[in-house]
Amino acid sequence: MRIQWIVRAASIVVLMLGVGAAKEIEPEAPDQPPAAHPAREDPLARSAPKTLARGAYVSVQVNVDALGFNILGDAANEPSIAVNPLNPANMVIAWRQFDSVSSNFRQGGWAYTFDAGRHWTFPGVLTPGTFRSDPVVDVDAQGVFYYQSLKGNFLMDTFMSTNGGVSWGAPVASYGGDKNWLVVDRTGGIGDGNLYGIWQRFAACCGTNVLTRSVTGGTTWQTPVPVAKWPTFGTLAVGPDGTLFAAGVDGTTSQNFNVFVVARSKDAKDPGVTPTFDGRVVEMGGYMQLGGGPNPGGLLGQGNVAVDH
């Protein structure tokens, strides 16, 4: 029987719609100090890793020690995953790492695999001791991974890995704001290799300018520009012709959790042109949900957009 492997962290990001009233989400900022994590250095503070089988599919815990065991006392959520297009057995996952459940201080955790998710290596966190949230990872057509995260000052860093996620280069300042998202153009067209970062405008660096672009492989980032309808708490996607799409809830005047929007840029792919956008409201029904388990201090999902290729 062929076994399909599913990787698992502490939460799954989906478009969550339901019945309820919209409410404001608090921006991310450190409010508790880091907590000691003695269990990480104690080989006895371990338990069997969590696995779950459902038919031919098996989920595998990724935030494990060097021997594949669960580390007691820590936690993780808000995972993001990317697959190397040149070697699908190579994947990278990013998440918010809580070294101790006694503190909500989070850092940038990650793990990588070279055997299609059967085994994972969790080396630690990026720039230890730095408050990091909203991690997003993506990969370009050449197999270079990019990891973007939000710091406590509402500015983002972007890291680059040329060895499959084993190690990362120095952080590159990338403007930013709360609940950021990242996408890389892998179309092979004029915009191939472009990186795009977006965020909400209510806890951010640059007012109503909420999207930045890199045309230099993430080494530099351009001055942010506005996006029609200001999609909030959503994601990005690149179409086969390089058209850039952004989706989320309407951020025109406030965080309208019951109004969903999609914005589109046909010229963002052109490195010599400042991106412009048009946008529209789309009827999805219901509300994006906030609070409650498993993430009582954050979103229960995001607005997701995807394009067929």
What are these regions (language model features)?
Residues 9-18:
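Bacterial N-terminal signal peptides
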Residues 23-309:
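C-terminal PAP-associated
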